[in-house]
Design a protein with these regions (language model features):
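Accessory beta-strand-rich segments of carbohydrate-active enzymes
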Residues: 1-17, 26-32, 36, 81-198
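Predominantly extracellular/luminal regions of secreted and cell-surface proteins
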Residues: 20-58, 62
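Surface-exposed, low-complexity/disordered Ser/Thr/Gly/Pro/Asn-rich loops and linkers
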Residues: 61-82
Length: 198
């Protein structure tokens, strides 16, 4: 996921990724076999796995082929160039909406949006367990109205309440291959890491 930000119509924004964010994320496979605590975002799956020591450098030797079972699923333990990913990956975090004096930023008159940009590629997004949308194209900016998924101040008073954000990268989501071509991997090159990991 890259550059998700919750933005109300008041002009307040809460960066959920990037250098201005203080929010911690967790990444895990759907079967619980692999867990990455505090992955750096924005980034990508392979970079997070490499930084956590779960995989070796995918650019070295045949690592991209011999380690594919980690991110693609256990069926990928072979030398076939093309195989379908079966393993889903889930990013989760919690965040709080700000309060100001006696007026909460969760008042019913405010509208909250989740803005998602540059996400590759098929992912379901949920807040507090409620599905709010699906992302299928890396080149599109998605804006989801999440007001109904966030409890209002009249329900919980003026104390900040934590909210859960879950992004599930599911290989069964139909997509059209709308992503940066150089990051897709080819028969002669692996996926491109999104940042310097030296």
């Amino acid at each position: 996921p890259e550059w998700q930000t919750v933005i109300p119509d008041t002009g307040i924004s809460i960066p959920l990724t990037g250098k201005d964010s203080s929010i911690d994320w967790e990444l895990h496979s759907d079967d619980g076999k692999y867990v990455v605590e505090k992955p750096h975002l924005p980034s990508d799956l392979l970079t997070n796995l490499f930084q956590a020591g779960i995989i070796d450098d995918p650019y070295l030797d045949r690592n991209f082929l011999t380690q594919r079972h980690v991110w693609m699923g256990d069926h990928a333990r072979n030398d076939q160039i093309y195989t379908n990913r079966t393993r889903s990956w889930i990013y989760t975090t919690t965040f709080e909406l700000p309060t100001s004096g006696n007026h909460s930023a969760r008042t019913p008159r405010w509208t909250w949006k989740l803005v998602v940009e540059g996400m590759k590629m098929g992912a379901h997004i949920a807040i507090n367990g409620v599905h709010i949308g699906t992302v299928t194209d890396q080149f599109l900016r998605y804006e989801f109205d999440v007001t109904q998924s966030l409890p209002t101040s009249t329900e919980y008073g003026d104390s900040p309440q934590s909210h859960n954000l879950t992004i599930t990268f599911d290989p069964t989501i139909p997509v059209d291959g709308r992503f940066t071509a150089c990051s897709g991997g080819w028969d002669w090159a692996p996926y491109v890491k999104s940042q310097d990991t030296q």
